[in-house]
Design a protein with these regions (language model features):
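An amphipathic, aromatic/His-enriched active-site/gating alpha helix that lines ligand/cofactor pockets
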Residues: 25-35, 51-87
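Conserved N-terminal glycine/acidic-rich loop preference
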Residues: 4-5, 19, 46-55
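A short, structured loop/turn motif at beta-sheet edges
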Residues: 12-14, 56, 98
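Glycine-rich beta-strand-turn "strand-cap" elements at beta-sheet edges
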Residues: 1, 8-10, 35-47, 71-98
Length: 98
C-alpha cells in the first residue's frame, strides 16, 4: 500500500538556496521511493512530501533520510515547541481521490 512522509522545515534567513541545493545533490535512489516534492509554505518555510511504494520501504529509508538531514541541518531553524529542526509525519494512504 502506498505511503507518504512529509517533513516541515524552517530555513535560516538567507540560506534557502543552500537548503534546496542540498536536496538536489541527493537524488535519492532509495528502494521504494517514487516521487519527492518540496513546497514553499511561507517565507523560509518548506515542506518535503515523498511518495513511497509501501510503508516498509519508507521505514527502511529512515537512516538514509537522517543522514541526508545531517548534511544540511545547519541551514535550519528550531521550530520551537520541543520539535527541533523538523516536524516529520508519515503513514499509509487510506483514501485516494482523483
Amino acid at each position: 500500500m502506498t505511503a507518504f512522509n512529509t517533513v516541515r522545515f524552517r530555513v535560516k534567513p538567507g540560506r534557502d538556496q543552500e537548503f534546496l541545493e542540498a536536496h538536489k545533490k541527493v537524488v535519492a535512489d532509495w528502494p521504494g521511493l517514487q516521487r519527492v516534492n518540496i513546497i514553499k509554505t511561507g517565507d523560509g518555510s518548506y515542506c518535503i512530501v515523498a511518495e513511497w511504494s509501501d510503508m516498509d520501504s519508507l521505514i527502511a529509508a529512515r537512516p538514509n533520510m537522517i543522514a541526508t538531514l545531517d548534511g544540511f541541518r545547519d541551514t535550519l531553524e528550531d521550530l520551537g515547541g520541543g520539535l527541533g529542526v523538523t516536524d516529520p509525519v508519515s503513514g499509509p494512504v487510506v483514501l485516494t481521490l482523483k
